[in-house]
């Protein structure tokens, strides 16, 4: 029962230059078919690797091609795993890949057999053999429902349902899902539902750990090879034993603890809410016990609630400094709060640091969109925004606006590396 097999959108992948000119686009017909289970699915998780080629995944496959269309590999997911989406990460030290997938045929504690939803990180070697997996429904608490009850049911990643716009779930509705065997790509608690919605995975080579972003727990979480949680960057509400001693304590720039009540903290510090791309900042700053984390804070259910007016919502890019020994977190940079609802991007988006330029890229995927929920159509199409910031700068050095467009994520593409790796 369940799964996210129906998550299938025709791919539109393009490279543009800084003047807005299209320089390359993918012709996917030879590797993609909307009507074929094994060749359908939403293409996501694009990354340019050190050799200049791009890797990504879609549906029941993960692939790697160079910019001229030469296949390096295009493989089905191993048996027992299904429904790739959102994220892949190559471990440069050994050539392994981390793929965000799901478990196919998981037997729950109540003996119900389900296909889980966006809650497994699979590790495969360079030949596609299974090395390890992180079954998050066993590592985390799939019944922590604080965020699930607060998020807007009308917009969950790329799933948009006009009938549910502005609505939230109750504890009673969540409980009935188990009673009614209601499984699948739906917001809900427990394995077999979209309780985690992991949308990014990173690897920390210093301690052989993964870092995940869980949209539906509004948390960025580090997990060791032993499958034990190392720390949780997110609101402290709803976490039970044994997770309570893994929660990071907010501090100011002087190391003084910041007081939080519920999910709201004093001063400018804030957690991320339904965030994307919780990634390690790979620079000289991240060393020893200190690690910097960047994220795109989408901002739905901020403070574990819906605001009085939808126009009060905003998104932001944010960078945190985590002291893994002291178990503290300091917010060192944010951008977007001052732009207000005009830059609000409730779904997708990205924040990422690039060491070659010592800068951060921010992609606001659905900024500027206005939607008529009665006709289920845009009254104003999104205008995604690409910003580049010098490290911790208050204003962007570069800003590109894609008028009347849609796109899941974006990243800088190195043409020289593509042709001269």
What do these predicted ranges mean?
Residues 1-421:
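Histidine-/acidic-rich catalytic cores in large beta-rich domains
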């Amino acid at each position: 029962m369940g799964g996210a097999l129906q998550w299938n959108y025709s791919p539109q992948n393009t490279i543009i230059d800084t003047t807005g000119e299209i320089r390359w686009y993918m012709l996917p017909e030879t590797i993609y078919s909307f009507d074929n289970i094994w060749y359908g699915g939403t293409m996501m998780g694009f990354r340019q690797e050190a050799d200049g080629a791009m890797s990504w995944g879609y549906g029941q496959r993960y692939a790697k091609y160079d910019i001229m269309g030469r296949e390096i590999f295009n493989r089905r997911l191993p048996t027992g795993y299904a429904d790739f989406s959102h994220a892949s990460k190559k471990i440069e030290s050994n050539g392994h890949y981390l793929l965000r997938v799901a478990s196919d045929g998981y037997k729950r504690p109540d003996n119900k057999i389900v296909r889980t939803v966006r809650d497994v990180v699979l590790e495969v070697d360079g030949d596609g053999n299974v090395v390890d997996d992180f079954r998050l429904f066993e590592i985390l608490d799939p019944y922590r429902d604080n965020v699930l009850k607060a998020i807007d049911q009308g917009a969950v990643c790329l799933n948009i349902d006009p009938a549910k716009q502005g609505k939230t779930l109750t504890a009673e509705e969540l409980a009935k899902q188990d009673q009614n065997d209601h499984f699948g790509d739906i917001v809900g608690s427990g394995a077999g539902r979209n309780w985690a919605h992991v949308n990014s995975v990173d690897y920390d080579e210093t301690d052989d750990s993964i870092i995940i972003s869980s949209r539906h727990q509004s948390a960025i979480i580090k997990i060791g090879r032993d499958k034990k949680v190392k720390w949780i960057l997110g609101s402290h509400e709803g976490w039970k034993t044994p997770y309570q001693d893994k929660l990071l304590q907010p501090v100011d720039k002087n190391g003084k603890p910041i007081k939080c009540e519920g999910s709201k903290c004093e001063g400018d510090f804030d957690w991320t809410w339904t965030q994307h791309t919780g990634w390690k900042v790979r620079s000289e700053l991240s060393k020893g016990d200190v690690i910097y984390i960047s994220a795109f804070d989408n901002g739905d259910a901020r403070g574990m609630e819906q605001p009085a007016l939808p126009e009060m919502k905003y998104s932001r890019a944010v960078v945190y400094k985590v002291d893994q020994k002291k178990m503290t977190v300091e917010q060192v940079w944010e951008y977007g709060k001052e732009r207000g609802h005009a830059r609000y991007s409730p779904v997708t988006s990205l924040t990422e640091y690039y060491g070659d330029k010592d800068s951060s890229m921010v992609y606001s995927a659905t900024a500027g969109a206005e939607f008529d929920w009665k006709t289920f159509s845009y009254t104003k199409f999104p205008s995604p925004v690409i910003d580049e910031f010098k490290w911790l700068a208050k204003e962007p050095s570069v800003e590109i606006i894609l008028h009347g467009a849609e796109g899941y994520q974006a990243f800088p593409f190195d043409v020289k590396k593509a042709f001269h790796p």
